[in-house]
């Protein structure tokens, strides 16, 4: 077990904060009926003060934690149903994000809150598809175009998350002694910076997030 931890230490470049850390101060908006859009295996039940609905697309494998199986642009609930929506690292995987945003607006109650996080500087990651990335202006545009009011929008996850992801993909594909030594040298440094550095997060963000309100 100890040997496995040592191997992981020298062979893992990336560090991703927990969903608790990512949502952070915005947890206070997760009250009432809350939709976890594109939930997958991500558990936010401990963050919700109210009733949680986990939604995801059908995959052929039953997940007892999913309450709603549907496309994200066709959620089978009535209008004005949810008090809050969490959509974390999902919108890049949908073919038509504007259509999804219109559906979010439909199913949310007036005065409800949307927490939406999207990637900017991140490699392609299929789940099962991967269509787009979002700049800060692009994120604001799709939110406001669909009649949400932006409360706050900001970069989060630092540039080291981007660099470490790329280095992880590249260097772990190489098996020579040289590249293995490079992994042992670089990966612990990158992982530390991912975890502890906020340098340039407002200028070179790996991702963006927005808190928006249905006025």
Model features per residue range: what roles?
Residues 10-14, 92, 200:
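Short, surface-exposed alpha-helical recognition segments that flank or form part
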Residues 11-18, 31-32, 36, 46-50, ...:
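A broad, low-specificity signal for short, low-complexity segments enriched in glycine/proline
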Residues 15-20, 36-38, 66-67, 191-194:
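Short gly/ser/thr-rich secondary-structure transition/capping motifs
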Residues 1-28:
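Class I SAM-dependent methyltransferase Rossmann-like catalytic core
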Residues 7, 11, 88, 127:
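Conserved short-loop catalytic and cofactor-binding motifs
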Residues 25-125, 135-140, 210-213:
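Conserved SAM-binding loop
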Residues 98-99, 103, 113-215:
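S-adenosyl-L-methionine-dependent methyltransferase catalytic module, highlighting the catalytic core
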């Amino acid at each position: 077990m100890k040997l496995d931890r040592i191997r992981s230490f020298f062979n893992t470049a990336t560090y991703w904060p927990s969903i608790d850390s990512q949502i952070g101060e915005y947890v206070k908006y997760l009250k009432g009926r809350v939709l976890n859009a594109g939930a997958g295996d991500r558990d936010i039940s401990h963050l919700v003060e109210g009733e949680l609905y986990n939604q995801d697309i059908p995959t052929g494998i039953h997940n007892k934690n999913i309450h709603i199986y549907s496309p994200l642009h066709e959620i089978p609930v009535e209008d004005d149903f949810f008090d809050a929506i969490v959509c974390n690292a999902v919108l890049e995987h949908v073919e038509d994000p504007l259509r999804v945003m219109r559906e979010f607006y439909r199913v949310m109650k007036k005065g409800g809150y949307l927490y939406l996080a999207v990637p900017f500087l991140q490699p392609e990651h299929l789940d099962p598809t991967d269509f787009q990335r979002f700049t800060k202006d692009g994120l604001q545009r799709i939110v406001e175009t669909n009649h949400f009011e932006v409360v706050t929008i900001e970069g989060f996850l630092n540039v080291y998350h981007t660099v470490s992801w790329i280095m992880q993909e590249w260097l772990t594909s190489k098996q020579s002694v040289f590249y293995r030594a490079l992994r042992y040298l670089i990966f612990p440094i990158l992982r530390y910076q991912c975890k502890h550095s906020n340098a340039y997060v407002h200028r070179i963000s790996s991702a963006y997030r927005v808190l928006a309100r249905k006025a």
